[in-house]
């Protein structure tokens, strides 16, 4: 059994006990989260439900494992022969979520 969920403008294929890294969600480690935007649901018997745009009555439950940050990305601009340069760093915030279950009504 698996589902395709949408969160943070991206789509993720998840199953029970999967650990996924998604865009930042508010909450501390151990907080329960629910994803209501399920785009596709497939049970173990081969039956598949495709949403238009979402599947009604299906939700994915998860638990926040950690709040992390990605690697540092450097944006560096330089104008030659002018002693002019600009260096700027960025680190994206991520949330690690463990999927606890998929419930279908």
Curated annotation (Swiss-Prot):
Taxonomic superkingdom: Bacteria
Pfam families assigned: Ribosomal_L21p
GO CC terms of this entry: cytoplasm; ribonucleoprotein complex; ribosome
Keyword flag Ribosomal protein: yes
Entries under InterPro entries matching the protein: bL21-like (IPR028909), bL21-like_sf (IPR036164), Ribosomal_bL21 (IPR001787)
GO biological process: translation
Keywords per UniProt: Ribonucleoprotein, Ribosomal protein, RNA-binding, rRNA-binding
A GO MF term: structural constituent of ribosome
Family stated for the protein in its record: Belongs to the bacterial ribosomal protein bL21 family.
Oligomeric form and interacting partners: Part of the 50S ribosomal subunit. Contacts protein L20.
Listed PANTHER family: 50S RIBOSOMAL PROTEIN L21, LARGE RIBOSOMAL SUBUNIT PROTEIN BL21M
UniProt cross-references to HAMAP family, sorted A to Z: Ribosomal_bL21
The protein's role, per its UniProt record: This protein binds to 23S rRNA in the presence of protein L20.
Protein name as it appears in the record: Large ribosomal subunit protein bL21
Taxonomic path: Bacteria, Pseudomonadati, Pseudomonadota, Alphaproteobacteria, Hyphomicrobiales
């Amino acid at each position: 059994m698996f589902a395709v969920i949408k969160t943070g403008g991206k789509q993720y294929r998840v199953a029970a006990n999967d650990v996924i890294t998604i865009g930042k969600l508010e909450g501390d480690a151990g907080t329960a989260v629910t994803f209501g935007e399920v785009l596709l649901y497939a049970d173990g018997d081969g039956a598949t439900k495709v949403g238009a745009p979402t599947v009604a009555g299906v939700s994915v439950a998860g638990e926040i494992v950690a709040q992390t940050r990605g690697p540092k990305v450097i944006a560096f601009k330089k104008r030659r022969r002018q002693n002019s340069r600009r260096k700027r760093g960025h680190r994206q915030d991520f949330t690690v979520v463990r999927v606890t279950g998929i419930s279908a009504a």
